[in-house]
Amino acid sequence: MNKSFTKKITKKNIFYIILICFILSVIPLYVIGMYAHPSVDDYYYGTETVQVWNETHSFASVVKCSFDEMINTYNIWQGNFSAIFLMRLQPGIFGEQYYFIAPLILLSAYIGFSIFFFYTALKKIFKADSYLAATVGICLTFVSMQLCTTPSDSFYWYNGAIYYTFFYSLMLFLFALLIRMRTAKAAGTIILTAISSVSAFLIGGSNYAAALFMCIILALSAGSAVYFVILRKNKVIRPYHMAAYIIVAAAAMAGLFISMAAPGNALRQQSVGGSTGIVKTFVYTFAFGGYSIAKVLNAPCLIFFICMIPVFYRIARRSGFTYRYPLLIAVFTFGLYCSMGTPVFYAQGLRMPYRMMNIIFFAAYVLITFNLIYFLGWIGNKFESKTYKQLIGGSTASYACGMQGYKFESKTFKQLIGGNTASNACSMQGYKYKKYSNEGDSHDENFYDKNFCDRDFRNKNAQKITADGITACEEPSMIKTDRACIILEKVIDCFFEKIKASRKNALLALAISLCAFIIACIGCIEVGETEYKSGDAGFGKLPLSAAATLSLINGDAKTYDCELTARDEYLRSTSDDEQFVTVPALSKRPAPIYHSDITDDPGDWHNAHVAMYYRKECIWTE
């Protein structure tokens, strides 16, 4: 490869290239969000607040109405207080033209908090450098968004997405703050505790998937902090850190307890039937956990993670962890991951909404990433150590060279196995050893003695090389033979150094991963008859950005926006005497912003929600 070109391939340049590509990929997602409109429960939960706004045009009155309705819902239907409060503030109540604020908030929250979480975790826990951590965070966020199963539920339908995607994103933000809190100073810990406690309390009052998962993580974090501070006397985690983790965990559990204690929960449970039972819930939980991971690991995603192995290996080796229990960690984290589905399986059986599936799929990327890093770290530790022992016939670097009275300095040994300098091992030019005397004193000695370059001198006291490894020299002053040097140079250099990809190669692997992912996505695209265009062909299984771009280019998004805007203006213009109204059906249903619409059946529950919103008896399509 051209050297001038190679010099330009730096971690900084690759980071900015991937960042620019990511920004370009999300531009269509924001643009098509300008054409989004309310759907289904947006109308139901906005019925009271839109009426208050139309009568008063007071934002404070709308907020008060939302709070009052939250209390009412808490008593008669469900206890997710923080989510219910936000649901009634959907932007469309202030005017249909303001609904674009919903996807703007939802997309920005997921993108920002997801990247921030991955960046913080990789940098603070695994000691990855800033550019690499940020680049990996961008790539993982990009892939999770492009392969989203039902993007309308996650980013463009306010009611469903604020309930699940937004609070899942807030949970990622909370976890990032908790990671940073571990090494924060006292003043910083106070600020982080305040922000984290409020976030944890609000998440506790949101959907039960995120609330339960968060409480388990926070309880484990608080317990770990107590263990390290009180029992281990850890100097990094201070007593004020321990207190902070306990406070945040208490806030989270308080929010969840208030939500679970709502009288409305029992009434709602009666409407859907009895609970599933513990045994069935347990089976459903783990069965769906396995299914969801298999669902996420489709061809594009699988290719992406395979191509990311060099990157994850570099991150794993940089951290310095021992990675001793890969199987235990995999089972434990899988159990945590599966807990997200437990509440809905217990309450409703297998009836899980797509918007909830989406956040479980998002969480799968976190699970796969950190387990893959841990497993690669275990592979590196296990097989590097084993190969060293086979090469040197012992367990220490000093025994490797047969220098029973000498010991390599760590830096020098790194140079010895690092590549080009290994070829100089025979002559020992510039290598230092630390010589230990009987009295325990030590001093550095440079070996430039001509005897070390003398082949006869070396061969005279050469050590034996067998298929199982290198035996120790009979005399402590003996140096390695030419053949031993070749083994060190060829095996260690070619094997380990190829696995231990340089920072440049790791970042190149990121770019290759994205290219392979895009190619795999293209291969998964289907062409067939659409659901709403009789006899007309369309594309299916498009990545999110491609689907949004196609809807913008072919005009479907614009047509959809015009038709729903005209419908809204017509319904607002009708008099109170007109209680039975028909409207034209939609001609376009553009992905990814279309969620659902009213039907030609006057008794359809979709129609009932829209009728309540516009204060009509019944609305249906022609």
Model-identified regions with their sequence ranges:
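Membrane-interface junctions at the ends of membrane-embedded or membrane-associated helices
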Residues: 1-8, 124-125, 179-194, 223-239, ...
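Intrinsically disordered, polar/acidic, low-complexity terminal segments
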Residues: 6, 10-77, 91-133, 506-622
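Transmembrane catalytic cores of multi-pass membrane glycosyltransferases
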Residues: 28-105, 158-161, 208-364
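Membrane-interface micro-motifs in multi-pass membrane enzymes
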Residues: 130-182, 207, 298, 338-373
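Aromatic-anchored segments of alpha-helical transmembrane domains
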Residues: 141-147, 200-205, 251-260, 333-344, ...
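Membrane-interface alpha helices of multi-pass inner-membrane proteins
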Residues: 190-217
